[in-house]
Amino acid sequence: MNKYLCFFLLVSGTIIAQSNYNKFSLEFASGYTSPVRPYLSGYNSNFSSFNHVNIGGRYMFSEKFGVRLEYVNDRFISSNDATAGTYFNRFGAQLVYNVGKDLDLWYITNESFGLLTHAGVGYTRSTIKKSQVVDQIGSVVIGITPQYKINDRSALFLDFSSVFNFKQHYRYDGSLISSDYVPVVGNHYNISLGIILYVGENRLHNDWY
């Protein structure tokens, strides 16, 4: 009985302690997007550009684990062909792990730098620029996010993410991959710079304490 009581008090104390910190944040980022495959020969460099926008909301269940919902827009547009290209709109959910806490980065850097990792799934609508055909794609995303704390209410972040697209029927230039409509696994990556806004009634956020 005493063991159960001690366990209950320990869990209750942890929950109360965590409730002293904000857990929710809003994230806005923009940056570079580049296709890896598939694309027609000679097109790859033309479709890499600063046409990436990411808007998300994150909730941390604890100081290390959380979940993130996001909307992402990537525009793969040719600099040489006005009719070629695709527009990717992705809606996703990811698990977030604060690896910076394990590395004690917040302590070593005097609460200035942090490091998050994330992985999850998404639903992507790829619109072909020339024909306006929509390709519906399932996506898997993995990434790493260094953070720099501005103050208790905001932080800058640099995100590196790789996106794997399952059942992709069209190349990034907008051409059909197979006349038999056989899909492939596509891949592109994003490098973005953004800002985190910490939301809540408390002064501090779980990211840093």
Positions of PLM-derived features:
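Short loop/turn motifs that connect adjacent beta-strands in outer-membrane beta-barrel proteins
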Residues: 18-23, 64, 101-114, 150-153, ...
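Short glycine/proline- and aromatic-enriched beta-strand/turn motifs that initiate or cap beta-hairpins
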Residues: 17-58, 66, 196-200
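Bacterial Sec-dependent N-terminal signal peptides
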Residues: 1-27
